[in-house]
Amino acid sequence: MKSIASKWVLGLAAFAFAASMSSALAQSENTGMGNWKLNVEKSKYSPGPAPKSLNIKFEPAGKGVKVTTEGVNGDGSKNATEYTANYDGKDVPMKGSPTTDTVSLVRKDANTTVRTDKKAGKVMATLTRVVAKDGKSFTVAVVGTNAKGEPVNHMLVWDKQ
C-alpha cells in the first residue's frame, strides 16, 4: 500500500516546482525552468515519512507552467504527478495525486509563488515557494492537513540540476 503521506509530499513537491516557474517568469523567460531535485537531507517533514527521492521538471506552457514530478515514496513505491497552470488563481486538475484534485497558482513577487491544493473542493494545503536570488535553489513551506486530518508542516529544499 502506498503511503498517503509520501504521495501527499510528492504532490506538494510538484507545487514547489511550479512556484519556481512563477518567480522565473517574473524575472526572465528561462529562469527556473529545467530539472530540480529534492534535497531530502535538508528538507523537514511533519509528519513523515520523507520520500526517498523526488525530481521535478518545469516547462513553459503558454502563459504558465507545466509541472511533472517523478519520485520514490518512503515505502519504496513510485509516484508521479502532472499539472499545467497559469498564475491566475484558477483551479486546474492535477493528475496522479491521491490527495489533490486541483491546484491554483498566484505569483506574489519575483521570487515568491503560492499554490493552493484542493481535494473535492476543500483546501488541503497552501504551499509557498521562494526562489533563492542566485537561482540555484528554492524552498517550499507546506502548511495544511493530510488525508487523516492531521496537521502538516513541511519545509522542502530543492537544488537545480
Task: Report residues per predicted region.
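Hydrophobic small-molecule pocket/channel-lining residues, especially in calycin-type beta-barrels
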Residues: 2-3, 25-161
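Bacterial N-terminal signal peptides that target proteins for export
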Residues: 1-12
